[in-house]
């Protein structure tokens, strides 16, 4: 029996407090996907990623998925004020997520997930008529590898 989990994250530029307020994530500073050596207090990280759903960010680890190969659908909804800003932000996040999937340190909650495919789609969203917000969805279909070794009964 395989398990499928859907996780949704929202990413936006950290300094754009008005946009964060419009997205209703203003003070939600929990790191949903802990990118390597990056957290929300790090001035070099230009964006925040916050959880809008439940899944592996709730404390579940790969050990809870032992057995059949399981799949996880991860959607990162990237929000920005302009299409150009959105493209730049989405590209940075894509690179960081790709790096994160390749991380192999023990203890990383998602380090055994391998992205099988991802696709992009633009959809404009307006929360305030004077401040349009562009969205890009980064969708990752992930396969959870079971790296545990089986013990021989011999």
Regions found by a protein language model. Give the residues of each.
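Conserved acidic
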Residues: 1, 5, 85, 132
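Small/polar-rich, solvent-exposed N-terminal microdomains that initiate assembly or binding
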Residues: 1-64, 100, 104-106, 150-154
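Short, charged, surface-exposed interaction patches
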Residues: 40-69, 111-132
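Residue-level signal for secondary-structure boundary sites
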Residues: 58, 84-86, 146-150
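Extracellular/virion structural assembly segments
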Residues: 65-67, 79-103
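Oligomerization/assembly interface segments of phage tail-like spikes and tubes
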Residues: 67-84, 132-145
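Acidic-leaning, charged glycine-interspersed low-complexity segments
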Residues: 95-154
